[in-house]
From Swiss-Prot:
Segments forming a coiled coil: none
Role this protein plays: May act as a regulatory factor during viral transcription.
UniProt region (Disordered), positions on chain: 1-21
Polar residues compositional bias, start-end: 1-12
Name used for this protein in its record: 23kDa protein
InterPro entries associated with the record: Viral_NABP
Domain of life according to the entry: Viruses
């Protein structure tokens, strides 16, 4: 057999392989992307859209596995995990670090790495890390938030309207008109809701002047 005949047979085999791969790729039906779920879902190919039964009113579409089931029809057991009677009692596997906060696992890892170092170096590094963590935690202390959600939570706790500062414990209907007919008491109330009691007592100019006067009276040596 001539060399050019061998090359021709090899080229023919490669063409057959390419055609076969192309037909396989064309036969693949692209499915929509589904996000990962916490529990296993029903197998693919059994959804109401693949069976063409999504338009029938007797079928109810499941929100978790997107599978159709009939209300008035007996079926053999739950078709999805969330349809089990004890689904509300199912729990995820326990986290081994659930009793620790977000910083303690990092601290434990740092201790395991610093074990071969001398004792004084270990104490210095851990003290610096703890000081930094304490400063970060103190930067966003509790009850000092100034966001809209924090204002709403504070107003709900103090039973005031977060828009206009109207007291809600009077059980009287009111029209929220923020910025209009704002008296000194309402402005102080709104400042208290927006800044919080701690920041309002420490940073409000009126309270700051009073605190300065008391400090001057207490620290005056006369």
């Amino acid at each position: 057999m001539e060399p050019h005949d061998q090359s021709g047979s090899t080229t023919r085999q490669l063409d057959e392989i390419r055609d076969r791969r192309g037909s396989q790729i064309r036969s693949v039906r692209l499915l929509p992307w589904r996000p990962f779920t916490r529990f296993p879902v029903c197998p693919s190919g059994t959804s109401p859209y693949s069976r063409g039964t999504h338009s029938q009113p007797s079928y109810v579409r499941c929100q978790n596995c997107e599978r159709a089931r009939q209300w008035f029809r007996a079926h053999d057991g739950p078709r999805c995990l969330h349809q089990r009677p004890d689904y509300s009692r199912l729990q995820a596997p326990p986290d081994p670090f659930q009793h620790l906060n977000s910083f303690e696992p990092i601290l434990l890892a740092a201790l395991s790495v610093l074990r071969p170092l001398p004792r004084d170096i270990q104490i210095t590094i851990i003290s610096c890390a703890c000081d930094y963590f304490h400063s970060v935690r103190c930067a966003s202390s509790r009850y000092l938030g100034s966001s809209r959600s924090a204002v709403k939570r504070r107003a709900a706790r103090l039973n005031y309207c977060y828009k206009c500062g109207h007291p809600l414990y009077l059980n009287k209907p009111h029209t929220c008109r923020p910025g209009r007919l704002c008296s000194a008491s309402i402005s102080e109330r709104l400042a208290l809701l927006r800044e919080g009691p701690i920041r309002s007592l420490t940073e409000n100019p009126i309270n700051a002047r009073a605190a300065h006067f008391l400090a001057h009276e207490l620290l005056d040596p006369r």
